Structures are given as structure tokens and as C-alpha cells.
């Protein structure tokens, strides 16, 4: 029979040891604004920490446009800033933009280096604005970004065989910055889908540009567990064939991310070493608003490594609609599927690089369930 006093002493000792162990874990371990990037290219070049080490007086909460702009412009210490987004923020403050120039002045949000922006409520969202990351070491997590709607699209008769309408501003532009992590962010046309815009000059009047673009020498970028929904031209990595200085830069990882009813550019790549793994693409070539055209655009000197992605696209069966030829000549895929069948592509697989970071990809048949459960804002 156990001596009661011995049993009590044993329990007490266990409790003390447990308390000591718990005391070695930071009290803020569950605070997502204190995280650094853990996957993909953003872990390289010294890693991506954002404002995770910000001093207490450099941590802001923003629930409206004025508070967000103040937090972005504030002078902060050497360890940067954290901005917590609560609820839906309308950058226009209820006053509709009248011109592209008006939108540029009132809608642009420049993100300083060493900044973490994180949604802390289930409905955290930025509307009627567009974000620029042009400085190093930025983290954006757990928010919805409604893609900006340009009130003044321009007609270009030389765009394509019949001309096209083009607009300005992406939901997020990463331009010339090193080390950016975009995690659990949802990008969507939201309240203004393309079927509401009508036509002119015989073509749909397009008020949207991109959702998320990476350009002008940006480098070491990871987009993880995010969601792109209902958009035409989604992601551009590399802005011009003539910008040859981008070669050796534009290192981007996109993984475990949803592409739902995305027509094209998921992503379209020039020059970059781009790793695309465990992404879930779902759509249809006959969708009434966002018909699928292609996913991965092979542009000039692009070096795409596609790995264990799952494509569920009604109306396609082969690689020609997965990897679109836009001047590239190499493309490596391993383990991806199209409507449950192994993807086979005719391109040279000699992309000339392998990921320098560790990762453990799922099999393609596990991707849909994982992405549906975990990708996008509100799922951290």
C-alpha cells in the first residue's frame, strides 16, 4: 500500500518540475505576431523576422484607416514594429475614389522594413487600398486583402489581338525588397467581381490588376498557407523581359496555398527560381466569370520547380494548360496531378537549382484536404 505522505510528496515534486518546465517556455509562445518565417526562401539570407522583436511601445492596434496609416508612418526603434489589425478597415474611409490618381494618393499603404502586420480577429481585412513592400524584412499574416478596384481603367489597343482594358494597383506589391513572408492571407476580388464591370470597345472592362506581384529584384519571399480566390491575372513574378538584372533574384516559394477560380498567372514567372509545392488549384475552363487559362507561366529565363501540386480543373487534361509557354524553356515538375492523373510535361527539367532549405512535402493526393483545412485568413 502506498504511503499517503509519500504519494503527496511525489505529486508535489511533479508539480514543481512541471512549473519549472513551463517557465522555460515564453509566455507569448502562442502570439502569432512574434513568429519568424519557418519555410521556403524567406528562411534564407538571414531569415525573415519582421517586427517580431519590436519593443512594447512599437506595438500598435489598428481598427481604422487613420490608425493603420499612423502605425505605418510612426518612428520606431531598431527592432521595428508590430501592427495588429482588428476588424474590417476601409482605406477610402467611405469616400469612393474618383480617378486612378486619387486612388494612388489616398489608397496606397507603404510598409516599412522590420514590420509585422497581423490580423487578430476572424474578420480582419483591408479594403479599398493597396500595399507596397519595398523595404526588407516584412511579415503579413492572417488577414484578407480585397483586391483594389481602379475606377479609371485604360484602353490599350496593342494589348492582344483585339486590345484590352488595363488597370493599376495590386493587393500587395513586393518590389525590390528582401525577405518577405506572406502567411495565411486571403486575396479576393470580393465584393467587386469581374462580371459587374460591363464591356467597352468589345472587351470586358477590367478594373483589377494583380493580386500579389513580386518584381524589380525582390528576393527571398515565401507565400504559405494563403488563398487566392476569384481573380483573373493573379501573380506576376518578374515585371519585364528587359529587366535582366532580375536574373539571380526573384527567389520565391509558394506552398500549401489555394488558387480557386484564378484565370491565369498562378504564377507567371520571369527569371526567378520559384518553388511551387503542395498548392491546390481548382477551377474550370468554362467558368462564367473567371475561366481557367493556365497556371504556371514560363517566362524569360524562368526556373520553376513545381512539386506535388494538385490541379482539379474541369476542361483540361495535360501539361499544356498547366505550364503556359511565355518565352521560357525549362520547367521541372515532380509528383503533381491533374484531375487525379500524374502530370507529364515535355519541357527540359534542367532548371539549374535545388531548394537550399528543408521541407517535407505531402503527396499530391493529400494536398486538397490539407489546403482546404488550413489555407487562408482566419485559420491560424
From Swiss-Prot:
Its EC number is 4.2.2.2. Residues 1-28 form the signal peptide. GO terms for cellular component: extracellular region. Ca(2+) binds at residues 170, 209, 213. It comes from the Bacteria. The active site is at residue 265. Binds 1 Ca(2+) ion per subunit. Its cofactor is Ca(2+). Pathway: Glycan metabolism; pectin degradation; 2-dehydro-3-deoxy-D-gluconate from pectin: step 2/5. PANTHER family: PECTATE LYASE 18-RELATED (PTHR31683), PECTATE LYASE 21-RELATED (PTHR31683:SF18). Belongs to the polysaccharide lyase 1 family. This is Pectate lyase. It comes from Pseudomonas fluorescens. The gene is pel.
Amino acid at each position: 500500500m502506498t504511503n499517503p505522505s509519500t504519494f503527496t510528496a511525489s505529486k508535489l515534486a511533479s508539480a514543481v518540475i512541471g512549473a519549472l518546465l513551463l517557465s522555460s517556455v515564453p509566455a507569448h509562445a502562442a502570439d502569432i505576431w512574434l513568429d519568424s518565417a519557418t519555410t521556403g526562401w524567406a528562411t534564407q539570407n538571414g531569415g525573415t523576422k519582421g517586427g517580431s522583436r519590436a519593443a512594447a511601445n512599437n506595438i500598435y492596434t489598428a481598427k481604422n484607416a487613420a490608425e493603420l496609416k499612423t502605425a505605418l508612418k510612426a518612428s520606431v526603434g531598431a527592432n521595428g514594429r508590430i501592427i495588429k489589425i482588428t476588424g474590417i478597415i476601409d482605406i477610402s474611409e467611405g469616400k469612393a475614389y474618383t480617378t486612378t490618381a486619387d486612388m494612388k494618393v489616398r489608397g496606397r499603404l507603404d510598409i516599412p522594413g522590420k514590420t509585422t502586420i497581423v490580423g487578430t480577429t476572424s474578420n480582419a481585412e483591408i479594403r479599398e487600398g493597396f500595399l507596397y513592400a519595398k523595404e526588407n524584412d516584412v511579415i503579413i499574416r492572417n488577414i484578407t486583402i480585397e483586391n483594389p478596384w481602379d475606377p479609371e481603367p485604360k484602353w490599350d489597343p496593342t494589348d492582344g489581338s483585339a486590345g484590352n482594358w488595363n488597370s493599376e494597383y495590386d493587393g500587395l506589391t513586393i518590389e525590390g525588397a528582401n525577405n518577405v513572408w506572406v502567411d495565411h492571407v486571403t486575396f479576393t476580388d470580393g465584393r467587386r467581381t469581374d462580371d459587374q464591370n460591363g464591356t467597352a470597345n468589345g472587351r470586358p472592362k477590367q478594373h483589377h490588376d494583380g493580386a500579389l506581384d513580386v518584381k524589380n529584384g525582390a528576393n527571398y519571399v515565401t507565400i504559405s498557407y494563403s488563398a487566392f480566390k476569384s481573380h483573373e491575372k493573379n501573380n506576376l513574378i518578374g515585371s519585364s523581359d528587359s529587366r535582366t538584372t532580375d536574373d539571380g533574384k526573384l527567389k520565391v516559394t509558394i506552398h500549401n496555398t489555394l488558387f480557386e477560380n484564378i484565370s491565369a498567372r498562378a504564377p507567371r514567372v520571369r527569371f526567378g527560381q520559384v518553388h511551387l509545392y503542395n498548392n491546390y488549384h481548382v477551377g474550370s475552363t468554362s467558368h462564367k466569370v473567371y475561366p481557367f487559362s493556365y497556371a504556371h507561366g514560363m517566362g524569360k529565363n524562368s526556373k520553376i520547380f513545381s512539386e506535388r501540386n494538385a490541379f482539379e480543373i474541369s476542361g483540361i487534361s495535360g501539361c499544356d494548360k498547366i505550364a503556359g509557354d511565355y518565352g521560357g524553356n525549362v520547367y521541372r515538375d515532380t509528383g503533381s496531378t491533374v484531375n487525379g492523373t500524374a502530370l507529364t510535361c515535355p519541357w527540359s527539367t534542367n532548371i539549374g537549382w535545388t531548394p537550399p532549405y528543408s521541407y517535407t512535402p505531402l503527396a499530391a493526393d493529400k494536398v486538397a484536404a490539407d489546403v482546404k483545412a488550413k489555407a487562408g485568413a482566419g485559420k491560424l
